[in-house]
């Protein structure tokens, strides 16, 4: 992947220029770092070949900066997981609330990262520039606030979230909350998993139970009981009717979702099981992590552990599989360390004897599990517990959420880059400062700059949310003459009839809106003898104000009167016609009906029939 370089930033003063009171001049901020995977994908799509022919026609990548243009996405290197290990720190993000991050999940298309924290809020981060996009209340409560679990459906149409008080909420991809199950559990919902068909989902809670919910009816079809303590993790096999759960009672249990029966129990761990995850690539493997400082990989066909992942000095708190490489596992610990394991490379420390894998043994059932050590260690990835890990769908960026309030992004190193081995995440802040690869003063200044950027991004997102949601047409948002625009940050006012309230009707100049009530028989007699009666507000034998009185017509007007001929007679006698005034009670032109100006119209082209 191609991205801007920020190496050497600690030794070169190219950060935010100092303010006047800091002894410097004011200038523009340094550009935000961007990770672009589009160019790598496009180049691979243009040069790829069938895998039996070598996969692609690009030149082999070498450790030189000139080969950055030849970087390939993980999908083009499925047989080389070592090239995908995320050893380089890309960016760190922190919310305005500065609270611990309990769960991180990439959106299905990979354009954004969704995080949930102790405040009960969802925070959305851009997946390319890593800037803040929006924040919203998700599981907020005055007594028990906090987002504890998130899960996207396989169809990418729904998101479910679990809260600290035991509630589960349904969300659309636009993060519109459409349903809430308030009494899903009696305690915090620690994990969620969808069935392969997306018709049901599984929840694990600290109330010692697991529940299978029907997504449509929002009711619990089955309650799985068998754990004796808090259930910390669960997962649903991607293709099989098989459930797995891990608990504080040190047990890993397999369940049949149809009969709610426990199939078997694994007792390999010696402390709380913190994560249980089926592999989406090799669906015969299950990975678990525990507070006993180890993680294990089980083979479902043998129903036993085949690998023990060692190396952590503190309890393992999180675990994730790579979405493309079946042999790459990443784990996070309570001391903030981030380790990456390759299942086909034991990486045994010097002085220790490597163990044989059960697959290579003539007696796999009785061969001890192979011990695997990390292929790479990021010892100081965070300063507190790493509670959640999640890979980008393309497999090139790993996101981590921690108790230290930070969300950090990690990726592979570029060709020829080795400076990352001396940064503060690998050797610590004191050692990095001693070697000159990190400056404590620059770190504080960079933190202030990032906080300012996040505040600015949040302010811009709030302005976007204040836009009117009614009927708005482009280019019709102006303030009326003499009026004052709404104070909505947009400085605009809708025109009447284009989404704004209609103006009051014009006055009727003293003409009553309706005639007084009269007996129909009497009205017919009056019309047949002396014409229509005058309104009370208009004296008889007088016209409307400003208009002359037309000569009275005796008798009843004929039904087929010619309006055009009548107009000619009035004009020949010198009687002026009032402008914009149509004589009432005139009969329509014969043989017309429809639209103005067309044959068969009931309405003439103008008020006088011309």
Swiss-Prot record:
Residues 1-29, 480-519, 574-610 are annotated as: Disordered. CDD domains: WD40. SMART domains: WD40 (SM00320). It comes from the Eukaryota. The keyword Repeat applies. GO terms for biological process: chromosome segregation; co-transcriptional mRNA 3'-end processing, cleavage and polyadenylation pathway. It is found in: Nucleus. Residues 601-610 have a biased composition (Polar residues). Keywords: Chromosome partition, mRNA processing, Nucleus, Repeat, WD repeat. GO terms for cellular component: chromatin; mRNA cleavage and polyadenylation specificity factor complex. Pfam families: WD40. WD repeats lie at residues 96-135, 142-182, 184-223, 226-265, 268-308, 311-351, 381-420. Required for 3'-end cleavage and polyadenylation of pre-mRNAs. Also involved in chromosome segregation where it has a role in chromosome attachment to the mitotic spindle. This is Polyadenylation factor subunit 2. It comes from Aspergillus oryzae (strain ATCC 42149 / RIB 40) (Yellow koji mold).
